[in-house]
Amino acid sequence: MTYIENVFVCMAAPLVVALLSLKRGHRAALVFCLAGMGACLLSAYLNTFFARLYQADAVNAATQIAPVVEEIMKLLPLLFFLAVFEPAFARFRLAAVIVAASFATFENICFLTQNGADQILFLLIRGFGTGAMHVVCGNVYGGALRPVWDSRPLRAACLFALLCVAIIYHATYNLLVSAGGTPQLIAYFVPLPTALCFRLLARKAGE
């Protein structure tokens, strides 16, 4: 049995200490790291709760429950940041990527502690695949929001639409991974090129 809250404490402790030693203007990145890991921790509890509530098996939980719960949990700290601080678009986009990357990092570490570290090739493939998938889901809030950033109604509508896109992408990834064999390999391969495409589009847009 893996006590993920203990893993969270071990990872969060040095970040909290670092927060205390930094000036206010330099703390944002660490705060979003903590938010991403906290979202992952809470998602694990919520996934378990809803899986038991709906009596879902492993495949249904991974493809129907986890994508919705995890993408909503990743978006919540971003919505708080947006509502309270009204950040510029570039800062919001950076926050989205940091939350997604720290979420994936915590998830990978929990997977590592639960399954061991003896299969390095599989861990690399899964680490880059799942990590890139979460980063891609964080990146969907990038270029699509820029044209409507100054309009609150359009921004809210786009945020909901992009959340749905992230959920569908996440669910498709989980479905392919659950299928095993060739579909699983495709799932592990696709997110990294997708993340690179996002980067190329951002560079083309001058971000």
State what each model feature region is:
Residues 1-207:
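Hydrophobic alpha-helical segments at protein termini of multi-pass membrane proteins
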